[in-house]
Curated annotation (Swiss-Prot):
Source species taxonomy: Eukaryota, Metazoa, Chordata, Craniata, Vertebrata
Region of interest (Flexible loop), ranges: 114-126
Residues annotated for L-methionine binding in this entry: E71, Q114, D259, K290
The organism of origin for this protein: Bos taurus (Bovine)
Function: Catalyzes the formation of S-adenosylmethionine from methionine and ATP. The reaction comprises two steps that are both catalyzed by the same enzyme: formation of S-adenosylmethionine (AdoMet) and triphosphate, and subsequent hydrolysis of the triphosphate.
Binding site for K(+): E58
Name of the featured protein: S-adenosylmethionine synthase isoform type-1
Positions of post-translational S-nitrosocysteine modification: C121
Amino acid sequence: MNGPVDGLCDHSLSEEGAFMFTSESVGEGHPDKICDQISDAVLDAHLKQDPNAKVACETVCKTGMVLLCGEITSMAMVDYQRVVRETIQHIGYDDSAKGFDFKTCNVLVALEQQSPDIAQCVHLDRNEEDVGAGDQGLMFGYATDETEECMPLTIMLAHRLNARMAELRRSGQLPWLQPDSKTQVTVQYTQDNGAVIPMRVHTVVISVQHNEDITLEDMRRALKEQVIRAVVPARYLDEDTIYHLQPSGRFVIGGPQGDAGVTGRKIIVDTYGGWGAHGGGAFSGKDYTKVDRSAAYAARWVAKSLVKAGLCRRVLVQVSYAIGVAEPLSISIFTYGTSQKTERELLDVVNKNFDLRPGVIVRDLDLKKPIYQKTACYGHFGRSEFPWEVPKKLVF
């Protein structure tokens, strides 16, 4: 089951235009994801009381300790100890035997007010529609018609494998599972005039934290039968699919005990699994004035709307901003040759249908609601409960 890869697998890429692509995901108990979820839980706690809160909350976690640091200006009164501990409890670290315990961990708080230099140029004395970007930067949105969600199959499968393990852990069906997990999926694709079509799953990798009282053989069997076969459509699996299940052989020490965690270190997991492009800015712990988050959501909204409207089969949208300036500096569209329209024509469609000022994005996508903790695991995109995943009906 954990055999060597056969060279570069050239035998499976003999078809013209065939290639392989890999994406990874991590579970709720991965230390970096713990931090993302805590940062967004803090953001939600403020937005519940003050929808106009300005939040930039970073989290660090290590054995027995959580540190909150950042800048927050808000009318809300938030019990940070409670927010942190409830988040860790929900994730599943509720006993010191697991290496981390919400009841006994130390919570340190180093949060200050937002810099008045930033406030005066971004939102003070401005109408909401004219709120400036909270910083400079470039953001990307991507969409592809290879799945109903307009997401790459590689990242969707990787997320679903982690979600399935969390489901089996919480239901008690696989009681040996612990919260920390990682998955990785390699898919063999073929190209069709710039669009990509998944043909088969080439490799699946799963590493998950576990109890002492389970054999490696039993873990591998359960992961294949109850996780992979429940998630990956049978048409993508064949006798040549490679499985690396618990390849380290042992993963008892996990979560913050195994590795330190920091907010914002899983930006590719959070987005498109390496497809498209990334501007470098993380999402979690940031309110809508931080265009790292809001503009990336808007760019995804634009990209998915273009694909669902049939204007292209695959598209990458880039936007850029300057601090204190409301209007984006640039909007760029790349369709990989999958559109009957020129990219200039598509840009005209985007400009007629979307207003990408932060103060308008927040209104159109309802970004003052406390919805963010849900985004902080299993990806920010490809999930129908979020407003930016509902394609806009385009006028063109």
